Curated annotation (Swiss-Prot):
Signal is among the record's keywords: yes
GO BP annotation list: muscle cell development; negative regulation of transforming growth factor beta receptor signaling pathway; roof of mouth development; skeletal system development; transforming growth factor beta receptor signaling pathway
Gene3D superfamilies, per database record: 2.40.50.120, 3.30.60.30, Elafin-like, Immunoglobulins, Pancreatic trypsin inhibitor Kunitz domain
The BPTI/Kunitz inhibitor domain, residue ranges: 299-351, 359-409
MF terms (GO), sorted A to Z: receptor antagonist activity; serine-type endopeptidase inhibitor activity; transforming growth factor beta binding
Pfam annotation, one family: Ig_3
Disulfide bonds: 33-66, 49-70, 53-65, 59-75, 116-146, 120-139, 128-157, 207-263, 299-351, 306-334, 326-347, 359-409, 368-392, 384-405, 417-489, 420-491, 431-540
Gene name linked to the record: WFIKKN1
This protein's UniProt keywords: Disulfide bond, Glycoprotein, Immunoglobulin domain, Metalloenzyme inhibitor, Metalloprotease inhibitor, Protease inhibitor, Repeat, Secreted, Serine protease inhibitor, Signal
Expression (tissue specificity): Expressed in pancreas, kidney, liver, placenta, and lung.
Domain remarks in the Swiss-Prot or TrEMBL record: The second BPTI/Kunitz inhibitor domain is able to inhibit trypsin. It has however no activity toward chymotrypsin, elastase, plasmin, pancreatic kallikrein, lung tryptase, plasma kallikrein, thrombin, urokinase or tissue plasminogen activator.
Domain Kazal-like: 108-159
Alphabetical list of PROSITE patterns matching this protein: BPTI_KUNITZ_1, BPTI_KUNITZ_2, IG_LIKE, KAZAL_2, NTR, WAP
Name of the protein: WAP, Kazal, immunoglobulin, Kunitz and NTR domain-containing protein 1
Length: 548
């Protein structure tokens, strides 16, 4: 028995060591990280590097502090050996409502959650928002609202100009503009230049922009799909990272990473978009070889279908007539003969004849500091805007005056639409109208040949109805005829916003009718309350007595 005493500490140590894998360490939470059970169990926080932590105590009781793809640690739901990786019943977003503007339901770890939208349509539909910024389209505004936890709504656009339309001031006003001066639209410090990187290499695209206030920068890769992925600063997207200064870094380049990467910079004064071409080649591109003149068919993508094996990872450049420049297309070739160019530069030199249109280039400030006010054309906004030019390394989209810019570039000559004018204010409009409703616009059908159209409205409240019996019939939807509409500048503007509207109009032959002077305004609580007070006090009857 005495001989066993020296062995007791050793046996106790072995016992504790054998159970170390099942019991949590000192201060740690029970369970293991998801990727310790299966490499496929990378969850959201581990792939986007959110919710950073240094130990389990920084996380909730049911979470572990696990390593993420950025080399740091994030809080994620703990897993246990033998537990199912996913719930037995399939989760669903049906009936799950996301109250935050710009968020959509998604399934995460077997539960429905709300995520901010990260893909938007690539078609422009410029939207001025209540935060003073101009967005590429409505989807971009909603995504930004979700990211910042705000509610943004559409407002009428107001174009801010930094200088008067006249020529620049005296020579002594070349000092750097003071912070208290008027807002300045975004401008690049240098023109985007095409880059070529070998497979497995690293590429860096820097959207270095100036502007006042400092512009917000996002990136997206142009594709042939309906929507593009919006890439924001301080985020990782696969092998792409966008840094806090608006620099896009692509690691371990693959052939399918080739394409046009578009930088969007915006502030309260304007919007700028610039394309950065990136080619991914199998070998070091030859610099001395002169490009051969291709056949016209070689510049265009191969549209014929081949029955043989395809090359999904072979991406070539072709000329896109609609865009006026080269873009990437998936390589299609019969018997291995793929048609196209390996780099953007080779495609442009061979297929883009002539110097090109300077008006489609982004505004470039340049690295010098001889500050001068200049004008540049924005193909997105279809108008000329002022910017600060440094004095060197600019491009052709650089004009001394607004007049010379508008003479050189396709500025629409039609005057802007004026604000819709009501025939009378709220009280008088209410008394002169046959109906007053609160509803949401569901559809607008234009009939330009008849100078009219039809608006379908989902009713929320009937405030006044003298001739249609909407409440008695329990009508939920009302079809309103739009009379005398100029669809170039529609009044009343029945397409503005998607919130509830106060709509007042006439009834002709049993049909609700709106004309250019009809009352259509946003249904604010104050406005609806005012209408109810007027109806309760029988203000219209008193007004008719005075008129008689």
């Amino acid at each position: 028995m005495p001989a066993l005493r020296p062995l007791l500490p050793l046996l106790l140590l072995l016992r504790l060591t054998s159970g170390a894998g099942l019991l949590p360490g000192l201060g740690s939470h029970p369970g293991v990280c998801p990727n310790q059970l299966s490499p496929n169990l990378w969850v959201d926080a581990q792939s986007t590097c959110e919710r950073e932590c240094s130990r389990d105590q920084d996380c909730a009781a049911a979470e572990k502090c696990c390593i993420n793809v950025c080399g740091l640690h994030s809080c994620v739901a703990a897993r246990f050996p033998g537990s199912p990786a996913a719930p037995t019943t399939a989760a669903s977003c049906e009936g799950f409502v996301c109250p935050q503007q710009g968020s959509d339901c998604d399934i995460w770890d077997g539960q429905p959650v709300c995520r901010c939208r990260d893909r938007c349509e690539k078609e422009p539909s410029f939207t001025c928002a209540s935060d003073g910024l101009t967005y590429y389209n409505r989807c971009y505004m909603d995504a930004e609202a979700c990211l910042r936890g705000l509610h943004l709504h559409i407002v009428p656009c107001k174009h801010v100009l930094s200088w008067p339309p006249s020529s620049p001031g005296p020579p002594e006003t070349t000092a750097r503009p003071t912070p208290g001066a008027a807002p300045v639209p975004p401008a690049l410090y240098s023109s985007p230049s095409p880059q070529a990187v070998q497979v497995g290499g690293t590429a860096s695209l820097h959207c270095d922009v100036s502007g006042r206030p400092p512009p917000a920068v996002t990136w997206e890769k142009q594709s042939h799909q309906r929507e593009n992925l919006i890439m924001r600063p301080d985020q990782m997207y696969g092998n792409v990272v966008v840094t806090s200064i608006g620099q896009l870094v692509l690691y371990n380049a693959r052939p399918e990473d080739a394409g046009l990467y578009t930088c969007t910079a915006r502030n309260a004064a304007g919007l700028l978009r610039a394309d950065f071409p990136l080619s991914v080649v199998q070998r070091e591109p030859a610099r001395d070889a002169a490009p051969s003149i291709p056949a016209p068919a070689e510049c265009l993508p191969d549209v014929q279908a081949c029955t043989g094996p395809t090359s999904p990872h072979l991406v070539l450049w072709h000329y896109d007539p609609q865009r006026g420049g080269c873009m990437t297309f998936p390589a299609r070739g019969c018997d291995g003969a793929a048609r196209g160019f390996e780099t953007y530069e080779a495609c442009q030199q061979a297929c883009a004849r002539g110097p090109g249109d300077a008006c489609v280039l982004p505004a470039v400030q340049g690295p010098c500091r001889g500050w001068e006010p200049r004008w540049a054309y924005s193909p997105l906004l279809q108008q000329c805007h002022p910017f600060v030019y440094g004095g060197c390394e600019g491009n052709g989209n650089n004009f001394h005056s607004r007049e010379s810019c508008e003479d050189a570039c396709p500025v629409p000559r039609t005057p802007p639409c004026r604000a819709c004018r009501l025939r009378s204010k709220l009280a008088l409009s209410l008394c002169r109208s046959d109906f007053a409703i609160v509803g949401r616009l569901t559809e607008v059908l234009e009939e330009p040949e008849a100078a009219g159209g039809i608006a379908r409205v989902a009713l929320e409240d009937v405030l006044k109805d003298d001739k249609m019996g909407l409440k008695f019939l329990g009508t939920k939807y009302l079809e309103v005829t739009l009379s005398g509409m100029d669809w170039a500048c529609p009044c009343p503007n029945m397409t503005a916003g998607d919130g509830p509207l106060v709509i007042m109009g006439e009834v002709r032959d049993g049909v609700a009718v709106l004309d250019a002077g009809s009352y259509v305004r946003a249904a604010s609580e104050k406005r609806v309350k005012k209408i109810l007070e007027l109806l309760e006090k029988q203000a219209c009857e008193l007004l008719n007595r005075f008129q008689d």
